[in-house]
Amino acid sequence: MNIVILAAGTGKRMRSALPKVLHPLAGRPLLSHVIDTARALAPSRLVVVIGHGAERVRAAVAAPDVQFAVQEQQLGTGHAVRQALPLLDPSQPTLVLYGDVPLTRAATLRRLADAATDARYGVLTVTLDDPTGYGRIVRDQAGCVTRIVEQKDASADELKIAEINTGIVVAPTAQLSMWLGALGNDNAQGEYYLTDVVEQAIEAGFEIVTTQPDDEWETLGVNSKAQLAELERIHQRKLAEALLADGVTLADPARIDVRGKLTCGRDVSIDVNCVFEGDVTLADGVTIGANCVIRNAAIAAGARVDAFSHLDGATLGANTVVGPYARLRPGAVLADDAHVGNFVEVKNATLGHGSKANHLTYLGDADIGARVNVGAGTITCNYDGANKFRTVIEDDVFVGSDTQFVAPVRVGRGVTVAAGTTVWKDVAEGMLVLNDKTQTAKSGYVRPVKKKS
C-alpha cells in the first residue's frame, strides 16, 4: 500500500511562523505522529507532500523511508495528492492521510484499507452532533454514497446531514491518477478537491465504502492553537488511562504530561503535575513527587524522587533518594542507596553506593566513591574558563560544609576534609585536610546603625 500524507498547508489560524504540522503534540511534531501511524501499516511507499515551510518540514521528519513531493501552490487536496503520484506504486492502493490529524489509530486505518479492496473507494467518515465546517456525505435512498459536498457548496438540506467526510480515503492508484487529472475547480474556493473524485469513482462503477473510527477524536484536526490544546488534553488523557490500566498510581490522571516514551514497572506512584520527556523508565516501586520534570532518565527499583526535582539524562540506582528541588543533568549517575537532597546539582558525575549530598551542593565532572558524606555548600570547581577537569573522591571520605575542590584533584580513601577547606592538591588516603585559619574576636565593636529618614 502507498501512503500519502498531506502537509503543505499554511496554517494561517495558528498565527505562527512555525509550519502547522511542526507544532508539538506531546513534545513531538504533529506530522511525526502521523508518520508513526503510517509506519505501523508497513507501506511500500510513504510520501509526504510539503509546501509551506517545505525545507523546515523536510528537515524535521526526514528519514530513509520517507519521500517528499512539493506542492508549490496550495490549490487544494486533490492538487496536493496529484504531486505525489510520480512517487507511488500504481499497482498498490493509496491511503491519503493528513499531517494535522495526529490521533487516528492504525487499527482504524487498517479497517478502512481492508474494506476498500478490488473495485472500491474507501472513505473514513464520522457522525457528529455539530457537523459545521465539514464536508457532508450524501447518500441515496438505498444508503449508497453518491457524493461528498463541502460546507460552502452544500444546500440547506445537505447542511442538515450529520455524517461528515474526514478526508481520509483509500483508492486504487492507477484510477486515482486518472480521476485527479480530470478534476475541476468550479467551486466556492476555486480549489481542486479530493472529495470530487468520489463522483468520478461512482461513474466508473466503483462502490464507495465507508468505515468509522471507534472514537470521534481520532479524526480531529488542528487548525488553531485552541484545537491543538484540545488534542493535547485528549492525547494525554489516553496516555494516562493506559498507565492506570498497567497498574501505575496517578494522583490525578488529568495532571500528568508524557512527551515521549514512559515505561513503568509494578507499583509505581506519580504525584501531580509531573512531565516526562524523551525515553524514561521507572522500575518497580518508584515514587515520583509533585511537579517533577524527568527527561531521558532510567530510575531503578524503589527509588524516590521528591517534589520539584528536574532530571535530565540521569541514571538512578535502586533505593536512591533525590530532592526535593534537586537537579540532575546529563551524565549524572547515582549508585544504589545514594542520596541527593535539596538544591543539589549533579552534572556528568557519579555518586557511589550509599553516598550522600543532601544540601546546597554542586557536583560537576566528579567521580565520588561509596559511603561518602558531602557537606552542605560543597562545590567542585571544574572549569577554568576554557577546559573542564575532574574531581575524584574515593570511598569513605567525609567532606565538611563549605568545601571547594579545585579540579583536577584526587582525594584518597577515608580522608576527612574539614569545613571551609579549599582542596587544590591531591590528598593521600586517611588524611585530615584543612586550611590554616585564624579567628579573631575584638571587643568594643559597635555595629553601624542605619539612620531613619
Curated annotation (Swiss-Prot):
Gene3D superfamilies: Hexapeptide repeat proteins, Spore Coat Polysaccharide Biosynthesis Protein SpsA, Chain A
Compartments in which it is found: Cytoplasm
List of residues binding acetyl-CoA: A376, N382, Y383, S401, A419
Enzyme class per UniProt: transferase
Pfam family, one: NTP_transf_3
Entry protein name: Bifunctional protein GlmU
GO CC annotation, single: cytoplasm
Co-factor note (free text): Binds 1 Mg(2+) ion per subunit.
GO MF term list: glucosamine-1-phosphate N-acetyltransferase activity; magnesium ion binding; UDP-N-acetylglucosamine diphosphorylase activity
Function: Catalyzes the last two sequential reactions in the de novo biosynthetic pathway for UDP-N-acetylglucosamine (UDP-GlcNAc). The C-terminal domain catalyzes the transfer of acetyl group from acetyl coenzyme A to glucosamine-1-phosphate (GlcN-1-P) to produce N-acetylglucosamine-1-phosphate (GlcNAc-1-P), which is converted into UDP-GlcNAc by the transfer of uridine 5-monophosphate (from uridine 5-triphosphate), a reaction catalyzed by the N-terminal domain.
InterPro entries in the record: Bifunctional_GlmU (IPR005882), GlmU-like (IPR050065), GlmU_C_LbH (IPR038009), Hexapep (IPR001451), MobA-like_NTP_Trfase (IPR025877), Nucleotide-diphossugar_trans (IPR029044), Trimer_LpxA-like_sf (IPR011004)
Family classification: In the N-terminal section; belongs to the N-acetylglucosamine-1-phosphate uridyltransferase family. In the C-terminal section; belongs to the transferase hexapeptide repeat family.
Annotated active site: H359
Quaternary assembly: Homotrimer.
The protein's required cofactors: Mg(2+)
Residue sites binding UDP-N-acetyl-alpha-D-glucosamine per the record: 6-9, 20, 71, 76-77, 98-100, 135, 150, 165, 223, 329, 347, 362, 373
Catalytic activity: alpha-D-glucosamine 1-phosphate + acetyl-CoA = N-acetyl-alpha-D-glucosamine 1-phosphate + CoA + H(+); N-acetyl-alpha-D-glucosamine 1-phosphate + UTP + H(+) = UDP-N-acetyl-alpha-D-glucosamine + diphosphate
Classification lineage: Bacteria, Pseudomonadati, Pseudomonadota, Betaproteobacteria, Burkholderiales
GO biological process: one example: peptidoglycan biosynthetic process
Keyword Acyltransferase: yes
Record has Transcription regulation as a keyword: no
N-acetyltransferase as annotated region, ranges: 247-453
Pyrophosphorylase, as annotated region: 1-225
Enzyme Commission number(s) of this protein: 2.7.7.23, 2.3.1.157
Predominant location category: cytoplasm
Keywords of the record: Acyltransferase, Cell shape, Cell wall biogenesis/degradation, Cytoplasm, Magnesium, Metal-binding, Multifunctional enzyme, Nucleotidyltransferase, Peptidoglycan synthesis, Repeat, Transferase
